[in-house]
Amino acid sequence: MSNNASPQAAYVPAVKPVSKSSKTTFHFGAGLLSGLTSSILLQPADLLKTRVQQSAHPSSVFSTVKAILSSPNPVRNLWRGTLPSALRTGFGSALYFTSLNALRTSLASTSLTNYDADVKKIGNGSSALPKLSHSANLATGAAARVAAGFVMMPVTVLKVRYESDYYAYRSLYSAGRDIVRTEGVRGLFSGFGATAARDAPYAGLYVLFYEQLKRYLSATTSSTELPSSSSINFVSGGLAAGLATAITNPFDAVKTRLQLMPGKYGNMIRAVRLMVREDGVRSLFGGLGLRIGRKALSSALAWTVYEELILRAEMKWARDEAEARL
């Protein structure tokens, strides 16, 4: 029986191909857990970003925090909107990771992505996902994010309205009822254009930067003591999110205004014109520091948790398959 341990231990690095046939339900569950973890822990930062961006004259983070802390229930107010945020991020992440895995697995089986060349060139690294070319990383990340964003858009609108102090909604139900009554079902999709314009390039750039950073970190540490896959994923996730966030922040600022005041701003182009004319170019970068901080932490947490869950599950599935052949 002692001979069984060695083949299993040696087999671990070769479990990557199993990701092509990973159970969809497990990818959904891993994405859900990773999204819930990051959204609940980082809800105060998300709320602060919404409050800073909502004003025609964006207030400072310090003054916003001071106002919340001086309220009757500061801790509760910092986590205001946690339920819609957790629903949006949790199920949004589940849909996103499931779609992303399906797209990447499908593309990896074609000759369009140079899958084999990539694997031979850089090795398996710390990723639980199939390796793709730069353009495929960009395209799959963007497509999966926009699809998940559309499905979760009503929850996103409820979250933003509930977090804002523009509205006095006492519950998510009252918020949803008021939006449908005054704006129709269309109101639940306010700002989708700006959201898609933000999420598509953000997600595409994120996956591109994330995979490249993991390859770079794996290559630069290959001659020294190898760090754990989780540490490589965490650092890569944080850096990739910071870069992608800085590039796409104007779309996020516009999206927030559209979801809070759709009657005033109307559409994305009109919103940009009004914001620049009334508040200057700096309004397009309102909440940038908060968004970078939150996105860096949330993406690092979400992707690390997701990839570790998938890697461990696939190792187990691979061992089970190997044992079944004995």
Curated annotation (Swiss-Prot):
Gene3D superfamilies, per database record: Mitochondrial carrier domain (1.50.40.10)
Membrane-topology descriptor: Multi-pass membrane protein
InterPro entries: Hem25/SLC25A38, Mitochondrial_sb/sol_carrier, Mt_carrier_dom_sf
Keywords: Membrane, Mitochondrion, Mitochondrion inner membrane, Repeat, Transmembrane, Transmembrane helix, Transport
GO molecular function, one term: glycine transmembrane transporter activity
Segments passing through the bilayer: 28-53, 81-107, 138-163, 191-214, 232-258, 287-305
Subcellular location: Mitochondrion inner membrane
UniProt keyword Transmembrane helix present: yes
Solcar repeat extents: 22-106, 135-216, 228-312
Reaction catalysed by this enzyme: glycine(in) = glycine(out)
A biological-process GO annotation: glycine import into mitochondrion
Cellular component, GO annotation: mitochondrial inner membrane; mitochondrion
Domain of life: Eukaryota
Family note: Belongs to the mitochondrial carrier (TC 2.A.29) family. SLC25A38 subfamily.
HAMAP family in alphabetical order: SLC25A38
Function: Mitochondrial glycine transporter that imports glycine into the mitochondrial matrix. Plays an important role in providing glycine for the first enzymatic step in heme biosynthesis, the condensation of glycine with succinyl-CoA to produce 5-aminolevulinate (ALA) in the mitochondrial matrix.
Name of the molecule in the record: Mitochondrial glycine transporter
Naturally occurring in which organism (per UniProt): Emericella nidulans (strain FGSC A4 / ATCC 38163 / CBS 112.46 / NRRL 194 / M139) (Aspergillus nidulans)
Organism classification: Eukaryota, Fungi, Dikarya, Ascomycota, Pezizomycotina
